[in-house]
Amino acid sequence: MQTMKANVFRGPNKIGIEEVPRPSAGVGEAVIRITLTTICGTDLHILRGEYPVKPGLVIGHEPVGVIEELGEGLSGYKIGDRVLVGAITPCGQCRACLSAQWAQCGHGEGVEAIGGWRFGNTINGAQAEYLLVPNAQANLAKIPDELSDEQVVLLADIASTGFSGAESANIRIGDTVAVFAQGPIGLCATAGAKLIGASLIIGVESDPVRMEMSKRMGAHVVLDPTQCDVVAEIKKLTGGGADVAIEALGLQVTFENALRCLRPGGTLSSLGVYSGKLQVPYDAFAAGLGDYKIVTTLCPGGKERMRRLMSMVQSKRFDPLPLLTHRFKLDQIVEAYTVFGSRREGCLKVAIMP
């Protein structure tokens, strides 16, 4: 039996590199040799026991690699093709997929599975030397020769999620947008709001490194919530309230502030992953009479979504490389989690290379 190195979750705060069986491709599946992956904030939730997955699972859900094996039923691919696979792997055939709700494919699978999020949730994930890709025809996106692995790895999740937060909010040309938290996803939401055409983008962040990166990604103003009343400042800057607020942290306080900073009829786009109960204060949405909209988003996946995101990088409309601040080998995965989780040395995202 062939084996490989992989980062295995063994319980809260217990991960590490182990030798595990190497996957083989069945019908409609492919095996890719991982050339680059990363760590997501959701992986931290898993590590801390805040999101339940089964012990023994290989975690990680942001894979870039080379096709090593193709199962029966696949066409248009060959061994050796460089591919990007989204964090969400839609089947392309179910009711959700046929309704263009790709992220909700297979809702209800596994242990509290969320839609089409399978890697590192219900099946083995990408922090390994090899990865089995289900529904490969719908999910293997070929990488253009002129793009490097580092240019595309963040498209699998944080760019797709952040952009989707802006898209789901239906930002219109000239809208005012406040983005709460400028972590990796919030920064991508800021970039997405800029690309769509917001006239004023207000970032909310207290970390100096992230405040500066927020401006680089497109924020016109960045407010430090430890130094001012951000709701009052946003209302002042926007003349009464933002058209759109994007919440990208997953805390009660940021959700509530995002709701309170809106104009009547405004939209709150929620991207954060919440660990506890979330409450909507009676007065924050005018007792239900303020025409507010609250929308939620799970990272869109599938090869067409990945192709579109890669085209944005290829045309130089979006540059994700500044977000990739640290690099580690797979054998250093525990250290990588520590650096990423503690934001040490201004860490935003880490590259993991087998």
Predicted regions: what is each one?
Residues 169-171, 238, 249, 262-263, ...:
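A generic alpha-to-beta junction signature in SAM-dependent methyltransferases
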Residues 43, 166, 190, 211, ...:
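Generic hydrophobic/aromatic pocket-lining and core-packing "Φ" positions
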Residues 83, 142-228, 232-233, 244:
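Mid-domain Rossmann-like dinucleotide-binding core that forms the NAD(H)/NADP(H) cofactor-binding site
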